[in-house]
């Protein structure tokens, strides 16, 4: 497990037991693993990606940090969302970041706080030189988050707006 902390949040990579509980949407099992949940996590996007995250964890015999992370409030261990990367850096050192906050925890700065910490962690790795992101054209919340983080719009495709992180 890889663990990062901010003032309010704890970010940690997802392990197989938590992934198993999430795949069954077993909120009691999630609580037994030490987390609080109001039932919003895992969301549908994360739920659909569980087979992919499991494959990465099995292939790597655990985590390298370039996979899925949960965002947890430090004061009560409630899972407020998730962030992470869509796999290891490519041969050019590029990785793609993603993030989501549970509906009841949006507009509280959790996503910016967590993603910034994760970006800093990734850029401290020798294998990472560039971070990208994408979001749907109508997802204004994610677009504002990306702008706050320092991403700039790189190009648009039929489905997504594609962003690139500009180091400060």
UniProtKB/Swiss-Prot annotation:
Pfam families: Acetyltransf_3 (PF13302). Its EC number is 2.3.1.-. The keyword Repeat does not apply. GO terms for molecular function: acyltransferase activity, transferring groups other than amino-acyl groups. Residues 14-168 form the N-acetyltransferase domain. InterPro entries: Acyl_CoA_acyltransferase, GNAT_dom, N-acetyltransferase. Keywords: Acyltransferase, Transferase. Belongs to the acetyltransferase family. This is Uncharacterized N-acetyltransferase YjdG. It comes from Bacillus subtilis (strain 168). The lineage of its organism: Bacteria, Bacillati, Bacillota, Bacilli, Bacillales.
